[in-house]
Design a protein with these regions (language model features):
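Feature for intrinsically disordered/low-complexity regulatory segments and propeptides
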Residues: 1-139, 147
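Intrinsic disorder/low-complexity polar-acidic segments
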Residues: 130-359
Length: 359
């Protein structure tokens, strides 16, 4: 089961990460890579020559993947060189940084030891627009105080994304007799190029506290803005992260997502999944599900177990078997993906559902 943060832990971590941020934009010809031995294996250090001195970043797995993709180095080959031919990897990276020069934004955290390397979190375009978690806390969270009864549910900050869910206990409906759901909201963001900032409905099933996100009714914003001109470290004052128009829309979206009208629309669609074609062969159906939606074998077996134990072979039963399995995974990013899959199943056209049910 993935760990989550309390409301207080969430705020503390957002502030801690914001204070530790170090973002640099520079021409790639002013960068160089060094591969050296680390505690858990070889690591890639990226040195960036800036007017303020050399900024050193030890790239994490996510940033290494972005560098590999941007430089046209197949990820499997990149990882093999990292392990078996570190010198070759450094030469490869340096060659393409200088042979095909571009301006890139490196997002990182400051070194914890003087003279050491910081953490390289992301390798991004110089048009990347920061809409960071600290801005969400400052500009969106205060709206929650204006919504009576809104209650914090869970949050997490992974290496690539931030998630926050809240629910509205006063707004709930039954999908079928004795099976109620509650309205909620999810705010999701990535500071490192792994997705848009989105505000979506979140549905909580009260019988087993399964969660489900509803992206069809979400509002999202891409992290794309004007080119960053200065080749230096930069702060909130030197970029256009302060997009007041967007944040005003975001605040209104929070209220819209939590409206009774929006909730009733979602409930009506979920209620339709109770009826219709029933699953005829659970094993075959979950195998088809796993193939179509890229579930692991462990996940498929978990969904099958939940489906059989739940005793509901309807579309509603299957989507809840999936969201129940989401609670069993150790990685919160994967949990969120499976919770989103629940809504994908609820949204399947009748013909596609029938094909899955009769597999």
């Amino acid at each position: 089961m993935a760990t989550t943060l309390t409301r207080e832990q969430m705020f503390a971590e957002i502030v801690k990460q914001d204070e530790a941020k170090l973002d640099v934009v520079a021409d790639t010809r002013r960068m160089s890579a060094v591969v050296e031995a680390g505690v858990g294996g070889n690591v890639v250090d990226l040195n960036v020559d800036t007017p303020n001195g050399v900024a050193a970043f030890q790239l994490n797995s996510h940033a290494r993947g972005q560098v590999a993709t941007d430089l046209g180095i197949p990820k499997r080959y990149f990882d093999r060189m990292l392990t078996e031919a570190p010198g070759l990897l450094a030469r490869n990276v340096d060659h393409w940084l200088h042979e095909q020069p571009e301006r890139r934004l490196v997002r990182g955290f400051k070194p914890t030891v003087e003279g050491g390397s910081g953490v390289g979190r992301a390798w991004l375009s110089d048009r990347y627009k920061r809409m960071d978690n600290i801005e969400i806390a400052r500009r969106i969270f205060p709206v929650f105080d204006d919504i009576p009864g809104l209650t914090f549910h869970q949050a997490q900050l992974t290496d690539t994304r931030f998630y926050m869910r809240a629910v509205l206990p006063g707004l709930e409906r039954e999908i079928k007799v004795g099976d109620a759901v509650q309205a909620g909201i999810e705010i999701k963001n990535s500071e490192v190029g792994s997705g848009m900032l989105s505000i979506s409905p979140f549905i909580l099933r009260l019988i087993c506290i399964n969660g489900m996100t509803v992206p069809d009714h979400s509002v999202a914003a891409r992290h794309v803005g004007k080119r960053i001109e200065d080749e230096t470290h930069f702060t909130d004052e030197t970029i256009e992260a302060d997009d007041n128009a967007f944040w005003l829309v975001a605040r209104d979206t929070v209220k819209s997502v939590l409206s009774e009208v929006r909730f009733e629309e979602i409930v009506a669609q979920l209620a339709e999944t109770v009826h219709g074609e029933k699953i005829q062969a659970p094993i075959a159906a979950t195998e088809t599900l796993a193939s179509r939606f890229s579930l692991t074998e462990d996940e498929r077996e978990g969904v099958l177990r939940n489906l059989v134990e739940g005793g509901d072979l309807s579309q509603w039963g299957l989507l809840n078997a999936v969201t129940a399995q989401a609670k069993e995974v150790d990685d919160f990013d994967r949990q969120a993906e499976l919770e989103g899959l629940g809504w994908q199943l609820a949204s399947l056209p009748a013909r596609e559902w029938a094909q899955l049910a009769t597999a």
